[in-house]
Amino acid sequence: MAAFNWILVASPCPACGIDAQLRCQTHVASDYTGYPGWRFHDREYQLGEVMAWWPREDKRFASWRADRWRGGERGSEIDEEACYASCPKCEAPLFVVLRFRENVAERVVAVGNEADWPAGYLK
């Protein structure tokens, strides 16, 4: 199982229409390694919050990318990921596409039902 973190985003649920806080599972800036006493895994972040990761001058910083988007360019500071999520109200399985600038989830690109997983994004 790969390491992951959580990004919290406010969005209407595409299944029930209720405004909800969606908890999106991301592999960006996630790793079972870390500093003594804590790992880059299973942490919650708000949209726009800097995710804990290696310092920029550390050679491991560049491994922040999840590489789960076929449109991404290696070496770019931008990555996108379709993340698993679910509605806390109706429990519908969802996806949320997030755009990252390095180790920051910048914005929501799309929200939909998991059955309609977007083309070009790995599950």
Residues covered by each model-derived region:
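A short, surface-exposed interaction/processing loop segment used at functional sites
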Residues: 100-123
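Short cysteine-rich clusters marking metal-coordination/redox-active sites
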Residues: 13-16, 87-90
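Short, flexible, mixed-charge glycine/proline-rich loop motifs
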Residues: 1-9, 74-82
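Short recognition patches in nucleic-acid-associated and regulatory proteins
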Residues: 20-73, 98-101
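Amphipathic, positively biased hydrophobic alpha-helical segments used for protein targeting
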Residues: 11-13, 114
